[in-house]
């Protein structure tokens, strides 16, 4: 049952309290609601100051770093090889995690708690009265496992102390292995199956219980539980084989030839510094992979050199093609074992799309809509080529696109140079402050910087932001680890460390004796909810003594994107943790985050925060507008490329039996046929599909981001484009999309927010309609 542990960056949960609870209760809503305007204004100003002003941050954080017995290493992070008594609490207020050794104790206590819940579930096999609450018990079991696995996953990515990273790794491995045993438990599956076969009990279930129970049941089936002994053995063998083949594919994922050899004359136009790095004597050795190869395509004047490089860049190694084809055949075998015609059918059954045919309808509609714009963008480059070559019959080839695009952008940038850099208006503090102001206006929630206890965070650069509702008080806790440091993952990400769920009355008495039950909670309308705790990590430059960390526009978009996930975690409050916040369909989960990116470019929202870090003067919007125009020169060409990649993903994970001859699968023919369909350039030999690494990680789901971006664009245009800071629009987004997490059919969510009932049932017509929606 994979729902026993979903990815950490996709969790959330809330909890009610009562006098019988030993949980840590959050501050009363009265502490945050009804504040004097001056206090609220002071809290707002503090957001910018704690990120941008080193002196303010030092004073503000001193309480949490000034423990006498606590030592610091030369890199500035806390040395955790000390006594537990040195700390007021552990990581994320988990008292187990004051030292690395506490991870093992936390894991052991969690497994003991899980064991008690499993015994309750197994008791339902012989005691029918226990079936009624089996689904909520399954959900509690899932929550216990996730709190260890997801916390460990985050610590592995962000903690600077190797001892803690190692402890987290060991905890993750131990709990993941334990979870996999449960995922394939016939006894646990039988309990859940009995629930749904008892019509009297089914009629008593809440909507959420039915949704979660169905998800868990399907996950059990996808894990092969319903197969006979031989089938289960085959299932385990195939999944192991697929994992190994995937690793082989990724490791061999490179062009057939590592470089091409050119003369100095043939490589003319290369950046001088790059040319010097690649030269040996009179020869230039241009790599066929990575950034140097891309830069060479943009710079080399000789078309034959570009053609040679481009063709070699798109010629995959024999090993890569072989690994990919073995991977695809094994996935087909797994799908057939599970009664599906293709791997895409197997994977998409619980997604918005439903099946691969619906995905292709969406992609075809989007491609037809995108193609004219893409051709128009390339026609501009073809005219530049004709002028440059003096040949009116010149045709733009695939290897010409990067070169002439760079020529065009160079001309445009020369005409639009400005003395002020955009980043000077985007300090980390102003951007986070702006996000808080935007959320306050559209959702009635905001950020309040909060001092941390000793031991609560993993590095002194980490800021804690409490997420506060104007009506409910504290509804979530966010830890912002935004600045780069050695050993930290460079990839921006949102992690849900502790998610939201209701704590039921029968749990409260047990919590007083449970060592893992100390969690911050929220009392709301007579219910107790666990407060969600999330962490954001980014890789922004470290603030300087003389100026704050300044962001590029792309980094601003990144922060808005990740905050979209964060707010989904905070507002997606459900009774069951399996469907809270970002725990929804994978082809729906990016909608809130992509939607948030729109606020990073809108003049009205920018006016709330985009100010010069030194003079405090507002951003001249024309400056950003020019930058945005430059970035959009080839937006349809880029979208066309992404659509074709998503189509390739579907084709290769479709019913490929017809392409298997004498036990051998020929992927090249499928790739060639797709390339011939509505092309942008004249045909040329290529086996690039063997270098498309996402075919492993995103198998049959590469379309998801395109679908979510399309839906986000539609929502923005219909609700927010005319009045982006509208509380009415924000309330609709919150009430129809965010608050449901994964407990509502995503098609009903999108139909509700767009007020388009035709979309509510989903299916082929809904997918096609979304693909053809006018977003301009």
From Swiss-Prot:
GO cellular component: mitochondrial matrix; mitochondrion
Annotated localization: Mitochondrion matrix
SUPFAM superfamilies found in the cross-reference section: Metalloproteases ('zincins'), catalytic domain
UniProt key word Protease: yes
PANTHER family xrefs: MITOCHONDRIAL INTERMEDIATE PEPTIDASE (PTHR11804:SF79), PROTEASE M3 THIMET OLIGOPEPTIDASE-RELATED (PTHR11804)
Protein family (similarity comment): Belongs to the peptidase M3 family.
Active site: 562
GO molecular function terms listed in the Swiss-Prot or TrEMBL record: metal ion binding; metalloendopeptidase activity
Top-level class of the enzyme under EC nomenclature: hydrolase
Transit peptide, UniProt annotation: 1-28
Any one Gene Ontology BP term: peptide metabolic process
Keywords: Hydrolase, Metal-binding, Metalloprotease, Mitochondrion, Protease, Transit peptide, Zinc
The protein's required cofactors: Zn(2+)
Transmembrane segments: none
Record protein name field: Mitochondrial intermediate peptidase
Species, as recorded: Yarrowia lipolytica (strain CLIB 122 / E 150)
Family annotation (Gene3D superfamilies): Collagenase (Catalytic Domain) (3.40.390.10), Neurolysin, domain 3 (1.10.1370.10)
Cofactor remark: Binds 1 zinc ion.
Catalytic activity: Release of an N-terminal octapeptide as second stage of processing of some proteins imported into the mitochondrion
Any Pfam family the entry gives: Peptidase_M3
Signal peptide coordinates: none
């Amino acid at each position: 049952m994979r729902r026993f542990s979903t990815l950490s960056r996709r969790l959330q949960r809330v909890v009610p309290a009562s006098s019988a609870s030993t949980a840590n209760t959050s501050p009363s809503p009265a502490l945050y609601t009804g504040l004097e305007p001056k206090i609220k204004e002071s809290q707002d100003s503090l957001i910018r100051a704690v990120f941008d002003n080193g002196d303010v941050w030092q004073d503000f954080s001193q309480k949490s770093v000034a423990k006498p017995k606590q030592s610091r290493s030369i890199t500035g992070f806390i040395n955790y090889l000390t006594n537990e008594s040195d700390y007021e609490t552990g990581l994320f207020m988990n008292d187990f995690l004051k030292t690395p050794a506490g991870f093992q104790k936390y894991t052991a206590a969690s497994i003991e708690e899980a064991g008690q819940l499993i015994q309750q579930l197994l008791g339902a096999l012989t005691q029918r009265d226990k079936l009624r609450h089996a689904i909520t018990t399954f959900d509690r079991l899932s929550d216990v496992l996730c709190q260890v696995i997801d916390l460990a996953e985050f610590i592995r990515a962000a903690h600077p102390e190797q001892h803690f990273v190692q402890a987290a790794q060991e905890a993750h491995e131990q709990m993941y292995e334990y979870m996999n045993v449960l995922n394939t438990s016939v006894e646990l599956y039988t309990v859940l199956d009995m629930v749904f076969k008892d019509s009297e009990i089914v009629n008593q279930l809440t909507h959420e219980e039915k949704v979660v129970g169905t998800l868990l049941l399907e996950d059990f089936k996808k894990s092969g539980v319903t197969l006979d002994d031989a089938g289960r053995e085959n299932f385990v063998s195939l999944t192991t084989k697929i994992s190994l083949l995937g690793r082989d594919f990724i490791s061999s994922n490179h062009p057939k030839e590592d470089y091409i050899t050119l003369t100095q004359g043939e490589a003319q136009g290369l950046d001088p510094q790059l040319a010097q790095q690649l030269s040996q004597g009179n020869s230039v050795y241009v790599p066929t992979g990575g950034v140097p190869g891309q830069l060479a395509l943009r710079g080399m004047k000789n078309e034959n050199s570009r053609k040679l490089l481009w063709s070699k860049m798109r010629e995959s190694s024999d090993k890569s093609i072989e690994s990919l084809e073995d991977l695809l055949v094994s996935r087909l075998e797994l799908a057939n074992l599970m009664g599906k015609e293709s791997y895409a059918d197997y994977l998409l059954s619980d997604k918005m799309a439903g099946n691969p045919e619906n995905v292709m309808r969406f992609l075809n509609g989007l491609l037809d809509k995108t193609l004219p714009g893409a051709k128009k963008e390339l026609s501009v480059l073809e005219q530049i080529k004709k002028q440059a070559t003096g040949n009116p019959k010149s045709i733009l080839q695939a290897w010409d696109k990067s070169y002439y695009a760079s020529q065009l952008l160079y001309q445009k940038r020369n005409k639009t140079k400005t003395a002020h850099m955009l980043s000077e208006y985007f300090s980390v503090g102003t951007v986070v402050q702006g996000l808080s102001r935007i959320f306050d206006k559209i959702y009635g929630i905001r950020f309040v910087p909060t001092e941390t206890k000793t031991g609560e965070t993993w590095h002194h650069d980490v800021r804690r932001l409490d997420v506060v509702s104007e009506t409910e008080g504290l509804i979530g806790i966010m830890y912002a680890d935004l600045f780069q440091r050695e050993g930290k993952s460079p990839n921006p990400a949102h992690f849900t460390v502790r998610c939201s769920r209701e704590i039921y009355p029968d749990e409260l008495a047990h919590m007083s004796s449970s060592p893992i039950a100390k969690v911050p909670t929220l009392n709301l309308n007579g219910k107790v909810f666990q407060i969600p705790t999330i962490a954001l990590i980014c890789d922004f430059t470290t603030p300087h003594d003389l100026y704050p960390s300044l962001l590029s526009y792309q980094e601003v978009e990144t922060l808005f994107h990740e905050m979209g996930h964060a707010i989904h975690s905070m507002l997606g409050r459900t009774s069951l943790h399996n469907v809270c916040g970002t725990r929804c369909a994978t082809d729906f989960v990016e909608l809130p985050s992509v939607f948030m990116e729109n606020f990073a470019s809108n003049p009205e929202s920018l006016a709330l925060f985009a100010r010069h870090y030194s003079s405090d003067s507002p951003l001249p919007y024309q400056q950003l507008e020019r930058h945005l125009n430059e970035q959009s020169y080839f937006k349809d060409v880029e979208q066309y490329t992404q659509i074709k990649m998503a189509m390739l993903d579907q084709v290769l994970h479709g019913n490929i039996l017809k392409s298997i001859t004498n036990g051998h699968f020929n992927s090249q023919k499928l790739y060639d046929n797709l390339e011939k369909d509505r092309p942008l350039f004249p045909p040329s030999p290529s086996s690039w599909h063997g270098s498309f690494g996402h075919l492993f990680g995103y198998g049959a789901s590469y379309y998801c981001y395109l679908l979510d971006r399309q839906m986000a664009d539609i929502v923005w245009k219909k609700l927010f484009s005319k009045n982006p800071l509208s509380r009415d629009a924000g309330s609709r987004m919150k009430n129809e999309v965010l608050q449901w997490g994964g407990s509502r059919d995503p098609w009903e969510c999108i139909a509700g927010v767009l007020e388009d009932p035709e979309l509510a049932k989903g299916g082929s017509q809904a997918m096609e309609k979304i693909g053809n929606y006018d977003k301009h």
